[in-house]
């Protein structure tokens, strides 16, 4: 988590025997540099936004790492493809640490099979394709985001947009026009509250239309979820509700949303 302090980061680096760390910027680099001598396994730090102006053999910008990678592939026969093919499904894919809010962070070992079985199960029930656009804003240290908004997108070759920060999510929805957003219930509660608050100052007729459309939508969705075909009258109402209400709500959410995926806790 980017909010972790140096002592917490140092514990995780020591506990995981980390050899290489990628950090976002100079601020995160400064937290880790002080731990270099106390983490015997740590060999390299890579700064992703190329903001390090004092590179060393052990601390380098991402652009420098790319250059070293090109040089390595030219001088070595071990190809990236062969390295991938050598991986076993029981090999460790990642260690995900708890946030540490209630004590010392605990590392959870996840294998390739652990995560890929979840991805495969997701793709069996969700009609995702390579044209999807994910908007990601949960930390990648959060297992829900890692699985739902990261590995799943990789598996289908989709595009991932990363929100600037939680306060900018509403703006980023309009800028990126995502088809899928993975989040925790709190975000959806905020969106719901914002719409309901807006209705309080809306004309009476608009409020009536909104709640009528909401009722139609619930009936229509329940039919679909139970593999039943909505009748002609309900379908007509749904089409009218879409034109009058749904389309306007969708537009405020970027206009292309197909799925909001919620996890981490039950929706109320």
PLM feature segments, named:
Residues 1-2, 138-142, 264-266:
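Conserved AMP-binding
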Residues 10, 81-84, 170, 246:
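Short hydrophobic/charged patches on amphipathic alpha-helices used for structural packing
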Residues 116-133, 140-243, 256:
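Conserved AMP-binding/adenylation subdomain of ANL enzymes
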Residues 26-41, 188-204, 243-255, 267:
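Adenylate-forming
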Residues 4-34, 118-135, 166-180, 252:
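Conserved ATP-dependent adenylate/AMP-binding module captured primarily in the ANL superfamily
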Residues 1-68:
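Structural core segment of the AMP-binding/adenylate-forming
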């Amino acid at each position: 988590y980017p909010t972790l302090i140096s002592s917490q980061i140092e514990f995780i680096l020591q506990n995981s025997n980390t050899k290489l760390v990628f950090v976002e910027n100079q601020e995160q680099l400064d937290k880790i540099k002080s731990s270099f001598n106390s983490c015997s396994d740590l060999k390299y730090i890579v700064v992703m936004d190329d903001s390090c102006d004092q590179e060393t053999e052990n601390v380098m910008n991402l652009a420098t790492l790319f250059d070293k990678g090109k040089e390595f592939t030219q001088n070595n026969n071990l190809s990236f493809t062969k390295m991938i093919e050598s991986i076993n499904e029981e090999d460790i894919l990642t260690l995900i640490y708890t946030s540490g809010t209630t004590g010392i962070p605990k590392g959870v070992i996840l294998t390739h099979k652990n995560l890929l079985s979840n991805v495969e199960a997701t793709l069996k029930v969700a009609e995702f394709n390579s044209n999807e656009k994910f908007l990601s804003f949960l930390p990648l240290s959060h297992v829900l985001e890692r699985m739902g908004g990261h590995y799943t997108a990789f598996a289908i070759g989709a595009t991932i947009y990363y929100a600037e920060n939680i306060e900018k999510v509403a703006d980023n929805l309009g800028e990126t026009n995502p088809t899928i957003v993975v989040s925790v219930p709190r975000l959806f509660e905020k969106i719901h509250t914002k719409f309901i608050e807006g209705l309080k100052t809306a004309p009476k007729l608009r409020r009536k239309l909104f709640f009528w459309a909401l009722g139609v939508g619930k009936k229509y969705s329940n039919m679909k979820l139970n593999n039943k075909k909505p009748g002609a009258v309900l379908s007509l109402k749904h089409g009218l509700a879409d034109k009058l209400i749904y389309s306007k709500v969708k537009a405020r959410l970027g206009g292309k949303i197909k799925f909001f995926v919620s996890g981490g806790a039950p929706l109320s």
